[in-house]
Amino acid sequence: MSSEKPTSLNAMRATNPCETPIQLLHEFGTKTGNHPVYTLEKAEGQAHNPSFTFRLVIGDITSLGEGPSKKTPKQKAAEFALNILRGDTSKCLPVTDTLRDPKKPPNQMQENPVGSLQELAVQKGWRLPEYTVAQESGPPHKREFTITCRVETFVETGSGTSKQVAKRVAAEKLLTKFKTISTDNIPLNKLIGNKMGCTWDSMRNSSGEKISMLKRSPLSIPNTDYVKMLKDVAEELDFNLTYLDIDELSVNGQYQCLAELSTNPITVCHGTGISCGNAHNDAAHNALQYLKIMCIKK
């Protein structure tokens, strides 16, 4: 009699009929070398009635799941992936209430990514996470917020129907990123270097050519390469400049990005455009306008 463990999904289901879709898919991934990866795509709704969407990737298969807790959409996505692996894409079995944690109400959040990220920062000796509202859009009854979360040199964005939701999504993305890298071996302080010392006072007192030109420039000339102009200012004042593209299009269907300046305090400006390059130029333009205001302001 063979002692070989079953590798087919039907055999695994027959061997362990009480396993949840997540458990079964994890077992299948372990035996085939394709481990499932779950990513939080969206979190919206109010705190008392949240809605989460998770993306699952296992090998070449991608599926989505949605639900009122973080566990339910993962189960749905896993169930759908299992159906694809079985060769039956016509059905996605419903996730029953037995899959939910009986100790928690369905609408109660199972995790606090904002608190978890702060705890991680304290454990590692990093500066606490910094959250910045990058954009507010949409009508008053359907607002959409985009928030950036920065921990040392790492930045992620989150979008949601409230600032709290967007903040949670951004924190969740950073936590996911930290799980894929070895945070113990990252020389974060060395990565930051000495480029965090560009303060508003040092900008106002600077007599450099580029910053002096910025102070007297109208910043309203059509077809100006604001990306190059901001790059020149950054090099002269010795601060880092990073463009972060946002995956989601704006409410008007345009590309979005953020321009992050490692000034002290950090500056983050939003930009939109019909192309990625135009969005960068718009973000650079907004950043230059902000720098100009702060340089003149006493």
From Swiss-Prot:
Annotated keywords: Cytoplasm, Nucleus, Repeat, RNA-binding, RNA-mediated gene silencing
GO molecular function terms listed in the Swiss-Prot or TrEMBL record: double-stranded RNA binding; siRNA binding
DRBM domain mapped to chain residues: 20-87, 112-180, 225-293
Pfam families named among the record's database cross-references: dsrm
Oligomeric form and interacting partners: Homodimer. Interacts with dicer1 and eif2ak2/pkr. Also able to interact with dsRNA. Associates with ribosomes.
Entries under PANTHER family matching the protein: INTERFERON-INDUCIBLE DOUBLE-STRANDED RNA-DEPENDENT PROTEIN KINASE ACTIVATOR A, LOQUACIOUS, ISOFORM B
Name of the protein in question: Interferon-inducible double-stranded RNA-dependent protein kinase activator A homolog B
Organism: Xenopus laevis
Lineage per the UniProt record: Eukaryota, Metazoa, Chordata, Craniata, Vertebrata
